[in-house]
């Protein structure tokens, strides 16, 4: 996701762990050109904490930092108490593309941040796994899943989901993924979306295409137009077998930014 029209820097932590505040600060300093730096942060406790610490240090160095929190995972909407709430998943790709295009076009820090927050607020995702992934070096998968069941609401760090259901056809699984997203976003006839059918690591392109075909049919039947789409392994959980679907409300402004030139390994047009 790093390149022309998208990110200036990315900060990977250890596998399934957040980057350290020191790593984030180093990336922030490297990306700073004097106009401020936008942090795009997936909503996980460690990530949020370390990015906030790094932002404080960056501010001390004279760098203006703005944060966009991505929290699109519908499966964790109902979490209460001291938990972080909805997790950040594949909608991060949409946020990064939009804010990257806006920054490349010369938008200031305030405008870029506002666009990113709008995209995050109007994006929802849901994932399903047919088999758990495994941490490198682990002797067994992160959770056990019988062959006649699927796990809904899995995360991108090997986390188990929020519920199990009977194994079903690709069309049935797509139905179960897409309908809660449509309901939560309150979209219907005449609305427009950007859709991502995302592989979790061990799902083939053909399987993802089958899911995406059904997603587009469901949306078309509801009068919802898929203006732009991505199909592929963009935000994975290493070797987990499964997929997620992301919907983002679209309008002319966002589509113009989406269509703006981008040159990264993941996206290029």
Task: Show where each model-derived region lies.
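C-terminal non-catalytic interaction/assembly regions of soluble proteins
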Residues: 180-269
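Short alpha-helices
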Residues: 70-111, 115-122
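Glycine-rich oxoanion-binding loops at beta->alpha junctions
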Residues: 3-34, 182
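Short Gly/Thr/Asp-enriched flexible loops that form oxyanion-binding sites at enzyme active sites
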Residues: 48-62, 207-213
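Extended, charge-rich low-complexity interaction segments
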Residues: 43-48, 95-109, 250-269
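Short, acidic/small-residue loops that bind anionic groups at enzyme active sites
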Residues: 5-15, 59-88, 221-226
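Mixed-charge interfacial surface used for oligomerization/domain docking
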Residues: 105-210
């Amino acid at each position: 996701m790093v390149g022309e029209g998208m990110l200036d820097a990315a900060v990977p932590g250890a596998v399934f762990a957040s980057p350290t505040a020191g790593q984030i600060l180093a990336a922030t300093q490297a990306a700073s050109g004097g106009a401020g730096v936008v942090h795009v942060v997936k909503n996980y406790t460690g990530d949020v904490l370390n990015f906030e610490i790094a932002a404080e240090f960056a501010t001390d160095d004279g760098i203006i930092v703005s944060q966009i929190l991505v929290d699109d995972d519908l499966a964790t909407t109902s979490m209460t108490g001291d938990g972080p709430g909805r997790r950040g998943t594949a909608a991060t790709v949409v946020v990064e593309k939009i804010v990257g295009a806006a920054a490349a076009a010369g938008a200031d820090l305030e405008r870029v941040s506002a666009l990113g927050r709008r995209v995050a607020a109007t994006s929802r995702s849901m994932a399903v796994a047919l088999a758990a992934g495994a941490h490198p070096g682990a002797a067994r998968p992160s959770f056990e899943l019988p062959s006649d069941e699927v796990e809904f609401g899995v995360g991108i760090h090997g986390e188990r989901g929020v519920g199990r259901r009977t194994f079903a056809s690709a069309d049935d699984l797509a139905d179960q993924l897409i309908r809660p997203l449509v309901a939560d976003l309150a979209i219907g006839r005449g609305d427009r979306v950007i859709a991502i059918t995302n592989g979790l690591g061990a799902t083939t392109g053909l399987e993802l295409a089958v899911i995406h075909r059904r997603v587009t049919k469901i949306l078309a039947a509801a009068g919802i137009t898929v203006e732009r789409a991505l199909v592929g392994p963009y935000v994975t959980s290493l070797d987990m077998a499964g997929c997620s679907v992301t919907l983002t409300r679209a309008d002319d402004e966002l589509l113009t930014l989406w269509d703006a030139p981008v040159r990264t390994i993941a996206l290029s047009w």
